[in-house]
Curated annotation (Swiss-Prot):
GO CC annotation, single: ribosome
Gene source species: Nitrosococcus oceani (strain ATCC 19707 / BCRC 17464 / JCM 30415 / NCIMB 11848 / C-107)
Protein name: Large ribosomal subunit protein uL24
Transmembrane segments: none
Gene: rplX
Function: One of two assembly initiator proteins, it binds directly to the 5'-end of the 23S rRNA, where it nucleates assembly of the 50S subunit.
Pfam families associated with the record: KOW, ribosomal_L24
Record bears the keyword Ribonucleoprotein: yes
Amino acid sequence: MRRVRVGDEVIVTAGRSKGKQGKILRILGDERVIVQDVNMVKRHTRPNPTANKPGGIIEREASIHISNVMLYNPATEKGDRIGFRRLEDGRKVRYFKSNDEIIDV
């Protein structure tokens, strides 16, 4: 089970996008994530007439190392550390370490 999942709200803790908040769009391998509207880069693309795509400068999200994001805790309105716990019925769930609130229900 991963500490962060697609759709989780995270805060960037390091780098040029430090302090920004967004949802995880994709997880690349074991170490990198793409966060919505964070770490934006510009890519220059050529026009492709066969695919009917115009050229130009496109702005998109670049990946961030997973150690540079923390899960956003709405109760404390900050980034928070994550722990794992087993419930009475045997399910493994994530919880916030600061206030013991369960994330996965």
